[in-house]
Amino acid sequence: LYGYFNSKEELFYAITDPVVNNLMEVLDRIRSEMDALPKKERLYGMGKVYYPNIPKIVDILIADRDAVKLIVNGAKGTKYENFLDTIAGRNALTISKTVKNIEEKTIRPIKEQTIEVLMEGYIATLFRLIISDKDRETIIRCMEMIGKIYETGIIALMQKVFMGE
């Protein structure tokens, strides 16, 4: 196998790049769809854009679980070393940007760093499910449920009523 590649790094990227590229294409499309929502609907409409795409995300990742395992467990020293954190950061930025642009008076922004920590937990959970031996339907169902818990929780944290203000 090494005869086809000049280095282990070249082999690593030959295995992992297709999965990452396919995933990022879907995530970029989702973000564009979210950005296209009217400002007034964006915070509460993000889930309506995201949830129908969970099966596509799961399909991309389970199509090559070995590549995903390499990204999660063997990416130290590669361009994918912080890949999960990068995705979490993108999600946190999208949420923070949405909240900053919202005109609703009952919502107050929470620190982007806090949202990023929450997103890191969510993304780590997604990837743990992918590298587990769970079947596609179980992963999709878990991701939908966990996503709704995170969505509801983040919105609750932003609501002034929740904070007693």
State the predicted function of each range:
Residues 22-33, 67, 121, 125-129:
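Solvent-exposed, amphipathic alpha-helical segments
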Residues 56-63, 76-103, 113-120:
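Amphipathic alpha-helical packing segments from all-alpha helical-bundle domains
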Residues 69-71:
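Short, hydrophobic secondary-structure boundary micro-motifs
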Residues 63, 93-100, 116-165:
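C-terminal peripheral helix-coil segments that are non-catalytic and often amphipathic
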Residues 25-50, 98-106:
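Short, flexible, glycine-rich and Lys/Arg-enriched loop motifs at helix boundaries
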Residues 3, 10-33, 48, 52-56, ...:
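Alpha-helical structural segments
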Residues 7-10, 66:
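Residue-level recognition of oxygen-bearing side chains
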Residues 43-46, 50, 76, 80, ...:
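Residue-level recognition of alpha-helical structural elements
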